[in-house]
């Protein structure tokens, strides 16, 4: 059995030296003839190996691998190394790793080889790292570079050393490894080496890595490390945004909101910011401003997203509330505080009337909600229905959600009207009201008032979850969808992780937190 050249190169570095046990055996038999001494020492090693001596098992594996003292046999070598490794012998584990790396005695498996090398290093095999450093220096081995990169990055057998990490990242990056190209580019960007960062982001972007596409666009848009080109930069960031990358969605939304490098377009800004807002505080903040300052203000959604972004934007909120041009928003929040925290419905209605006069349809919606509240001593559901209808005419989508509940129960109505209730619920869900999406999803899930449709239910639940407002029943039903692998779900590959997240899911309470933080 012949060994290939790469195996010979590796063996010269990786195999453990003859054990001290063998040297001692030879010494002990030094008075006997040389041939007999060698034969006896081999038999002693075999005997010890058969009795379970891990060092002897490793040594016997070395002999079978190299053909020294025995007939060469990779598979038998691996069997002995496996026995040694089972007893946590670091040399045996390291030699097993070599077999998996080269495919000698077993099917080649780089992942298993990498795992075994790291295990051997952790258990004290100090020779592996310098051996692989020499291999990289001599041949530029991609496998060895990856092993060393991981070791220096995570402190496996060595102290963490980010400079060395970058050295081995570059070896991998030059070989065409897209993840290494991206990681190296990010490292360069963080250390203000924008030109080199741009080079490697571009290489990774060519291979379709969405994060690299985003960063390449970001650098072009801002002229970092490359000549500034806002149009091309925005096009690349948009490409990444369409691949559901929140950072890209935020930057594209911001550009449209501010008219930076492109014509100002609030509708497009809302689209991109809305896709990112559930995961990106800056996107949530800007989305709130879009709803607040749009041609037709939507105070319901503006408040929802501004409250989501409140932590980290305290100064921005204080500045917003101090702005005399934002009196409508100020009064709306003050009214919500009276409604939710103080249960002072009379004071709340007064503030919501002020909001109405300033052009906010949600002021009418919240007047109705205050009048319909079960704790309001002056409760008037008929008047509430009338106000909800008026609010809808003024453009309040939230009013459709509240009014649908009244049609469903018949409160304030002459009779129950489930058909109209469903119509209004759909209107609210399509308008971005998360709790309407939850409720409509529950209906599709249960087949209540609509034909049962798990796919439609899952779509609605995902929309509500993106706003951090999934109800407990919706979360439970979404778990059911993941357990059964419905294709509409975008991340089925991570179904187990998603199920665990959903089991612990708690809807956002950001609005109440914001209201509690407001000064009188």
Identify the meaning behind each predicted range.
Residues 29, 318-326, 330, 489-520:
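Terminal, low-structured helical/coil segments at or just beyond the last alpha-helical repeat
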Residues 8-17:
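Bacterial N-terminal signal peptides
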Residues 50-53, 66-68, 73, 86-90, ...:
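Short helix-capping/linker turns of helical repeat alpha-solenoids
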Residues 21-62, 121, 322, 326-330, ...:
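N-terminal leader/linker segments that initiate helical-solenoid repeat arrays
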Residues 59-66, 95-102, 131-135, 147-154, ...:
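Hydrophobic face of amphipathic alpha-helices that form TPR/SEL1-like repeat modules
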């Amino acid at each position: 059995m012949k060994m290939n050249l790469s195996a010979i190169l590796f063996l010269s570095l990786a195999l453990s030296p003859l054990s001290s046990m063998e040297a001692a055996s030879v010494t002990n038999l030094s008075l006997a003839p040389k041939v007999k001494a060698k034969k006896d020492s081999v038999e002693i090693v075999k005997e010890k190996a058969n009795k379970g001596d891990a060092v002897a098992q490793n040594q016997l594996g070395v002999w079978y691998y190299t053909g020294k003292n025995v007939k060469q046999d990779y598979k038998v070598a691996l069997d002995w190394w496996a026995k040694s490794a089972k007893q946590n012998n670091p040399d045996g584990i390291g030699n097993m790793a070599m077999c998996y790396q080269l495919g000698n005695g077993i099917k080649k498996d780089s992942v298993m080889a990498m795992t075994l090398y790291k295990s051997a290093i952790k258990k004290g095999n100090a020779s592996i790292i310098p051996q692989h450093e020499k291999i990289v220096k001599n041949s530029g081995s991609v496998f060895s570079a990856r092993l060393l990169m991981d070791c220096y990055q995570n402190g496996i057998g060595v102290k963490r050393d980010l400079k060395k990490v970058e050295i081995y990242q570059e070896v991998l990056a030059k070989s065409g490894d897209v993840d290494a190209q991206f990681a190296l580019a990010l490292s360069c960007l963080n250390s203000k080496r924008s030109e080199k960062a741009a080079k490697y982001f571009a290489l990774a972007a060519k291979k379709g890595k969405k994060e690299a596409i985003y960063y390449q666009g970001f650098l072009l848009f801002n002229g970092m490390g490359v000549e500034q080109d806002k149009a091309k930069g925005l096009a690349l960031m948009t490409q990444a945004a369409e691949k559901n990358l929140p950072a890209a969605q935020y930057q594209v939304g911001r550009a449209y909101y501010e008219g930076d490098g492109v014509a100002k377009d609030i509708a497009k800004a809302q689209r991109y910011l809305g896709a990112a807002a559930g995961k990106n505080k800056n996107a949530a903040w800007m989305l709130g401003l879009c709803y607040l300052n749009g041609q037709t203000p939507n105070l319901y959604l503006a408040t929802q997203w501004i409250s989501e972004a409140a932590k980290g934007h305290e100064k921005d909120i204080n500045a917003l509330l101090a702005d005399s041009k934002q009196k409508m928003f100020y009064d709306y929040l003050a009214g919500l505080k009276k409604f939710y925290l103080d249960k002072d419905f009379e004071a709340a209605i007064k503030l919501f009337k002020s909001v109405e006069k300033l052009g906010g349809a949600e002021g009418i919606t919240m007047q109705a909600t205050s009048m319909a509240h079960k704790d309001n001593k002056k409760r008037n559901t008929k008047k509430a229905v009338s106000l909800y209808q008026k609010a809808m005419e003024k453009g309040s989508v939230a009013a459709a959600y509240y009014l649908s509940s009244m049609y469903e129960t018949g409160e304030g109505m002459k009779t129950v009207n489930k058909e109209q209730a469903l119509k209004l619920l759909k209107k609210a869900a399509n308008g971005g009201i998360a709790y309407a999406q939850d409720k409509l999803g529950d209906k599709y899930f249960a087949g209540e008032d609509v034909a049962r449709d798990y796919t439609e239910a899952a779509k609605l639940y995902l929309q509500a979850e993106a706003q951090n407002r999934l109800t407990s029943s919706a979360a439970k039903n979404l778990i059911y969808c993941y357990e059964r692998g419905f294709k509409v779900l975008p991340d089925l590959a991570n179904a187990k992780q998603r199920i665990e997240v959903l089991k612990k899911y708690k809807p956002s309470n950001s609005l109440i937190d914001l209201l509690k933080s407001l000064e009188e």
